[in-house]
């Protein structure tokens, strides 16, 4: 892959090939190297949670590493990313919803387009979901002791609903969603304590 990429670079496609090379290199350094310490513990917890729902060990391994990569890249708690993913798709890469949400993080096509990711690409979906979650944390994370909860509600209902109701909207789906994410997060957090 790297040789092919560098050959293309010499044929005039240097910038695109160089960006791809850097991406592959960075991913290999941050995700594929053996994990140590706290990262290994987080990996084990996320892998265990993913494997409870998704019995494919290769996918679960990849998902756990991708969550840690997205977490480090966008400064979002990896347990929160995993809790949202568990609630959204139960770690199923091909998940879809009647409303049109796609993939592991259940991105809506318009949201994915506005972020600039392909929602059908599992890594793009995780990165897009993490960016969207980071945006909601930036918007609502400072709303007192319930800031993270409000950000999670915004991930589900959209930020407009949060502004309209000055907090978590009265939608049953959103209120249930917040409870499910909180429950998943606390389960993951407790797994880290052992």
Spans of features found by a protein language model:
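Catalytic glycan-binding domains that act on GlcNAc-containing polysaccharides
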Residues: 38-194
């Amino acid at each position: 892959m790297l040789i092919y990429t560098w050959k293309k670079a010499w044929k005039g496609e240097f910038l695109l090939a160089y960006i791809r090379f850097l991406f592959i290199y960075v991913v290999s350094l941050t995700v594929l190297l053996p994990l140590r310490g706290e990262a290994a513990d987080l990996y084990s917890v996320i892998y265990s949670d993913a494997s409870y729902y998704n019995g494919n060990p290769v996918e679960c391994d990849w998902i756990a590493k991708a969550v840690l990569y997205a977490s480090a890249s966008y400064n979002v708690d990896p347990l929160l990313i995993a809790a949202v993913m568990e609630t959204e798709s139960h770690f199923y890469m091909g998940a879809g919803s009647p409303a049109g949400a796609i993939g592991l993080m259940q991105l809506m096509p318009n949201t994915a387009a506005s972020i600039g990711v392909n929602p059908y690409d599992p890594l793009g979906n995780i990165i897009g979901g993490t960016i969207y979650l980071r945006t909601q944390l930036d918007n609502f994370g400072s709303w007192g002791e319930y800031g993270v909860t409000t950000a999670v509600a915004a991930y589900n209902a959209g930020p407009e609903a949060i502004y309209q109701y000055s907090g978590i909207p009265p939608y049953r789906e959103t209120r249930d969603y917040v409870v499910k994410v909180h429950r998943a997060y606390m389960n993951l957090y407790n797994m880290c304590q052992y």
